[in-house]
Amino acid sequence: MIEEWNFVGDTLRDGRPIPRDGEWLEHTGPVVICETGLHASRRPAYALEYAPGPVLCRVECDEIAEEQDDKLVCRRRRIIVRADITETLRYYARMQALSVIHLYDDPPDVVLDYLMTGDESIRAAAWAAAGDAARDNFDALIYEQFGEAA
């Protein structure tokens, strides 16, 4: 048995309810990586690529059928512990955005404020301002390509 990572949504991908911590989930039928079976990832970052929701689980895997560098598929899996990491994901996204903010010619103050503070009361305004700026930049690029004035 091996411990790995897995994100869950409201239900399993096949519609079954998420089992309680410590309860074994078993797959019947063929177990083929990227097709059928119970999957898990080697690192939380790898698991994030397949995340159907913000709840990250530390899982124990048994009867492993196939393995790749980033993931595996098994017949039996159980959740050891889980946590809703929504706030951690939002914080990480804001930090990633700030790491490239120097590429943004003139970011609106509300965008900078949100990225630096995570203040939910200004998130919608920041999203709208960033969207407006992105659309303006895209339009300018297309107008230039077509030889038209903005």
Regions found by a protein language model. Give the residues of each.
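Short, glycine-biased loop/turn motifs at secondary-structure junctions and
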Residues: 1-150
